[in-house]
Amino acid sequence: MVRLLSRWLPLLALLLMSGCTSLPDGARGRFEARAVKVDGETAYYQVFIPAASARTPGSLPVVLFLHGSGERGADGVKQTHAGLGPYLREQAADFPALAVFPQAPGRGEWSGRNNRVALAALDAAIAEFGADPARQYLTGMSMGGYGSWNIALDQPGRFAAIVPVCGAVLAPRAVRPTLFVEQVAGETDPYAAIAQRLRQTPIWIFHGALDDVVPPDDDRRLHAAFQNANARDVRYTEYPEGNHNAWDATYADPAMWEWMFAQKR
């Protein structure tokens, strides 16, 4: 019996140690479901609430995240399964901000009512959790990258910083004619128009050089337009070996978050 116990003692010790190092629920951030009514219809979204130990003194910063095409739907959850959501689950004990995850319906784009839903969800989260209106941040990936430009152009004085990931302005309209930045659709030079209207907003654009879904050409042109407009602080990072999923490297980059949270309105 003693010999049998001695064989299992190392395993028992390991299990006890792992149990001791796991964090209690209150020490980790969590997602909670919420709903908002816009134009008479209810839309569901998620809010990431940071752990108390991760919060800095004062009001919480808040990040509005716009998902890509693959996360569209009506379940109110799928939008947390790619991009920022998985990163927050990995960093649930340390991420210091609220994050709001609206969801566009099945074949919708980030435009019109869907953008109103996103902003209504953001407003509701700010009111419920006492977030800092001067520290609102906007990011989106792929379709959400387009949406980031649309919402930022519609609300030019609202966000302290914008981080569009693998988005574009016009391309690839031939493949998907509904996917474009509608706020500048009538402009002769939409890149220059965006740069002029947002040149006072800190922006960090990310893209993969090998992106074969949304090629990086538009983001390169946008960055050049911002430079020509003498923009206040616009950066562009292109991952040489990166494909469309540039969001994985972007959201895992501590320098990006440090820069973002340093911005205030």
Stretch-by-stretch model annotation:
Residues V62, L66-A121:
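Active-site machinery of serine-nucleophile hydrolases
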Residues Q46, V62-L66, L98-Q103, R135-G140, ...:
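Structural recognition of the beta-strand scaffold that forms the well-ordered cores
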Residues G145-P156, I162:
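Short glycine-enriched nucleophile-adjacent loop
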Residues A161, C166-Y251:
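The feature captures the conserved acid-bearing segment of alpha/beta-hydrolase catalytic domains
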Residues C20-V62, T139-M141, V184-G186, R220-A224, ...:
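A domain-start/cap signature at the N-terminus of enzymes
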Residues M1-L9:
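Bacterial N-terminal signal peptides that target proteins for export
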Residues L9-S18:
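Bacterial N-terminal signal peptides
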Residues A51-G58, R107-M143, P156:
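Gly/Ser-rich "nucleophile elbow"/oxyanion-hole loop immediately N-terminal to the catalytic nucleophile
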